[in-house]
Amino acid sequence: MARISGIDLPKEKRVEIGLTYIYGIGLPTSQEILEATGVNPDTRVKDLSEEEVNAIRDYVNKNVKVEGDLRREIKLNIKRLVEIGSYRGIRHRRNLPVRGQKTKTNARTRKGPKRAIGGKKKK
C-alpha cells in the first residue's frame, strides 16, 4: 500500500485518482506530479514500484503544500483577515458568506438553522 503524506492511497484506483485522496491535491495537480515523476497515470496504486512511490513522495514533499501545512496556512490567512478587520474578515467572524452572495433568503448552511423570532400574539 502506498502511503504519501500520511495518507494511505486506495489500492485498486488509478494513481491519477488515488493521489486526489490527499488534501490539497486535485486532478490537475495529480497529473502534474505524475508527468514530472514520469509515472504512467493509468497504473493502479497496487502495481507501483517502490522507486515510483518514492519519486512521487519526494516530489510532493518538495513542491506541493498538502494536508496539515495547507490547512494551517488557510487557517492563518483567515485569522489574519479577521485581525486586520477587513470586510472578508468581518464576514468570517459573523459566520456569513464571504464571497458576495445574497443573504436575505439563502445562506442557510453558513447561517445555521432558522431561529424563531418572538412577537406579539394577536387576540
From Swiss-Prot:
What's the superkingdom here?
Bacteria
Q: Which InterPro entries match?
A: Rbsml_uS13_C (IPR027437), Ribosomal_uS13 (IPR001892), Ribosomal_uS13-like_H2TH (IPR010979), Ribosomal_uS13_bac-type (IPR019980), Ribosomal_uS13_CS (IPR018269)
UniProt-listed PROSITE patterns: RIBOSOMAL_S13_1, RIBOSOMAL_S13_2
Question: Could you name the Gene Ontology cellular component terms for this entry?
Answer: cytosol; small ribosomal subunit
Which segments carry the region annotation Disordered? 93-123
Any one of the GO BP annotations: translation
Does the keyword Transmembrane belong to this entry? no
Q: How does the record describe its quaternary structure?
A: Part of the 30S ribosomal subunit. Forms a loose heterodimer with protein S19. Forms two bridges to the 50S subunit in the 70S ribosome.
Summarizing the function annotation, the protein's role is: Located at the top of the head of the 30S subunit, it contacts several helices of the 16S rRNA. In the 70S ribosome it contacts the 23S rRNA (bridge B1a) and protein L5 of the 50S subunit (bridge B1b), connecting the 2 subunits; these bridges are implicated in subunit movement. Contacts the tRNAs in the A and P-sites.
Protein family (similarity comment): Belongs to the universal ribosomal protein uS13 family.
Q: What is this protein called?
A: Small ribosomal subunit protein uS13
Give the taxonomic lineage as stored in the record: Bacteria, Bacillati, Bacillota, Clostridia, Eubacteriales
- State the encoding gene: rpsM
